[in-house]
Curated annotation (Swiss-Prot):
Name of the protein described by the UniProt record: Methionine--tRNA ligase
Record keywords, A-Z: Aminoacyl-tRNA synthetase, ATP-binding, Cytoplasm, Ligase, Metal-binding, Nucleotide-binding, Protein biosynthesis, RNA-binding, tRNA-binding, Zinc
Top-level class of the enzyme under EC nomenclature: ligase
Binding site for Zn(2+): 147, 150, 160, 163
EC number(s) stated in the UniProt entry for this protein: 6.1.1.10
Domain tRNA-binding: 579-680
Major localization class: cytoplasm
Reaction catalyzed: tRNA(Met) + L-methionine + ATP = L-methionyl-tRNA(Met) + AMP + diphosphate
Motif segment ('HIGH' region): 15-25
Subcellular location: Cytoplasm
Family: Belongs to the class-I aminoacyl-tRNA synthetase family. MetG type 1 subfamily.
GO molecular function annotation: ATP binding; metal ion binding; methionine-tRNA ligase activity; tRNA binding
GO CC list: cytosol
Amino acid sequence: MDRQFKRTLITTALPYANGPVHIGHLAGVYVPADIYARYLRLRGRDCLLIGGSDEHGVPIALKAKAEGCTPQEVVDRYHELIKRSFEGLGISFDIYSRTTSDIHRRTASEFFKTLYEKGEFVEQTSEQYYDEEAKQFLADRYIIGTCPHCSNDRAYGDQCEACGTSLNATDLIDPRSTISGSAPVLRETKHWYLPLDKHEPFLKEWILDGHKEWKSNVYGQCKSWLDMGLQPRAVSRDLDWGIPVPVEGAEGKVLYVWFDAPIGYISNTKELCPDSWETWWKSEDTRLVHFIGKDNIVFHCIVFPAMLRAEGSFILPDNVPANEFLNLEGDKISTSRNWAVWLHEYLEEFPGKQDVLRYVLTANAPETKDNDFTWRDFQARNNNELVAIFGNFVNRALVLTHKYFDGAVPPKGELTDYDSRTIEEFAAVKQALEHQLDTFHFREALKEAMNLARIGNKYLADTEPWKLAKTDMNRVATILNLSLQITANLAIAFEPFLPFSSAKLMSMLSTDCPFGWDRLGSTDLLPEGHVLGNPELLFEKLEDSVIDAQIQKLQDTKLANEKAAHQAAPIAEDIAFEDFLKLDIRVGTVLECEKVPKADKLLRFRIDDGLGGRTIVSGIAKHYAPEELVGKQVCFIANLPPRKLKGIESEGMILSAEDADGSLRVIMPAAEVAPGSQVK
């Protein structure tokens, strides 16, 4: 950061209020933004962290329609859930507001009117699908049809979620309205467009020449868009949910959500600072930083800056440290498939472990490429790093001090060369941390913070104060004094990353007033004689059973998705009725059932068929334990010729249905019948 700014305005992408937030949102946007804001505050810098819910647009209208309620009821419910979830994880917003607020409606309308009156829009007429039964134009998500690329017959007008291809509504084969189910027709409609091509020369110079320090993934995506050439982009659409376009002749039209949403950063700042918001948005000594995911790079690096420049009085973003995507157990996170770890559920199922999630998401952050979250890695990082390194060092330092010095910080005596080298090592952490945090390398910054705990662990292991206690208590005092100073330094270094654990550690150190960042690296944070609090476990080991339950939860979701997506096999060719009558299907009671030796798929049944009994061998051993079927009634074909399987003569075939996941389910009568009863 070459320029000297007086203040930093940090914004976070507005989460869509049609569902909860998940770990992908957190890793990509909210945890790194919170780390950065906490770091700046700790350094005494003037900064604001601005957030809020994005509450307009087609997905919310669709959600309301599906749930049989109003869009306002949908956003009211999810806005509160999202806000509580962020608070639970310690995301320290100065304000978390929403785009249905009165102040946002006014701000967005005024912004549009300013550009409209300056002649910054162009009007264009285009053809758009119209539902004649519902008497309304259809947004992309209100149209489904067959994808021309993969033949999925549930593709939307903007994207096929089966193959991931971006589409135009007119690309769909046999399009139909999701409102009425009827085939839509094309009609002309007028909209206002922001001519991005007009701003292209400025954007090329501003980004490609002026911001080469941006992350490579951000700079590269911007360059790709600029190299292709920018096109006008609609700022209005035909919809009944949103902020009405505030000009004559715009009945039934609202502001496009991509235009409306980023103005939420401005309106939320206005709401927080009604008298000073312009200082944050219009002063050249304010640094504006957008935290977003990679799907929002174009909007925040090209479109929103073009809007701000067209308005003429606002500052432009100085940096946009966008992250890539986080996957889950090797698969793309999907809200529609419920393939996610939802924050509100995590907070309920892992009480008091907010920092474990913050740690893992930061350590595994998708900063320059997509990354993967797995529950086994979550467990390993907790047990092997937070517990075994950080927590272990803190616990040993405090427990030994209580054991040998009644919990009071002992005096520091003469330092050895090893002591001095250790002090130099942990004093260097401050500069390393600052470099990584200032350049938005949060994953590397976390490694530097954890390195401080490693330094402490190594120091205790090498000096072995528990052995010296028998012969040299003065030396033990010096060792534990330095160990406690490292512990206090850990409370500072980890505050941006693990605020709950940092506060807990400060409490164990009996320090009410947090140390300032400027004291990081100091060896006199805790004065001689200062009485410590009682040591507690800073982190707890996660057992396999806890993680197994989460993995099973995902497996259940995967099975449910497979069943939902299952398509029945095509109907076989017609047969003559007489051929069907040849089958003698009967009901029998299972008397015995056992596995066939040296055959992992086969079970041997002894069946009461009402005619003296029979033996049947069936290939369902992978789907049932033998004892599950004893005493049950099953349907079987009785008039098949006997055949030998693994040396056993089988006298029939037990009927099963194959489920969507490939599992077999034996066909059983709904109520018990006499053995040998025929199925008709």
